[in-house]
């Protein structure tokens, strides 16, 4: 009988979250939709497609009013990379927000987790995390790519 990998628990761990200044939206499109021209890249640009719908997380500045969307959201990225075997990261970070009745939209990328909170609740979310021992800092400035 083969042993399954042991998961590392995030219980009691503290994390550093980077807060991004850009305002994002979460838009819903019909299943099989092409990526529309208005879906601008942003700090976080994510496309999730299922058999029933397509969700896009993108910059909010160009989304047409007729498109079903929610936002604006402020993005917080958990400093990573996070090991795939690590468990409880989102629980440790989302439980304080649930207790404070702050809604979230979570997105995971290969190296880390992103937590989007309504922009009007971003300061409250940061304060809840700090109370639990987590660190919230402004996002590092990305290096400019040279041609």
Predicted ranges, named:
Residues 1-96, 100, 124-147:
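Regulatory modules associated with amino-acid/nitrogen control
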Residues 53-58, 112-118:
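A generic structural motif
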Residues 100-115, 121, 142-145:
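A cross-kingdom feature marking solvent-exposed beta-strand/loop segments within repeated
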């Amino acid at each position: 009988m083969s042993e399954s990998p042991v998961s590392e628990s995030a219980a009691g761990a503290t994390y550093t979250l980077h807060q991004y200044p850009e305002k994002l939206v979460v838009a819903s499109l019909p299943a099989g939709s092409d990526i529309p021209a208005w879906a601008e890249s942003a700090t976080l640009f994510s496309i999730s497609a299922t058999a029933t719908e397509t969700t896009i997380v993108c910059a909010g500045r160009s989304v047409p009013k007729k498109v079903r969307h929610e936002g604006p959201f402020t993005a917080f990225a958990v400093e990573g990379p996070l090991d795939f075997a690590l468990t409880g990261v989102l629980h440790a970070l989302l439980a304080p927000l649930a207790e404070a009745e702050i809604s979230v939209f979570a997105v995971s990328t290969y190296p880390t987790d992103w937590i989007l909170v309504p922009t009007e609740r971003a300061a409250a979310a940061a304060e809840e995390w700090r109370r639990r021992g987590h660190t919230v800092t402004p996002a590092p400035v990305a290096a400019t790519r040279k041609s």
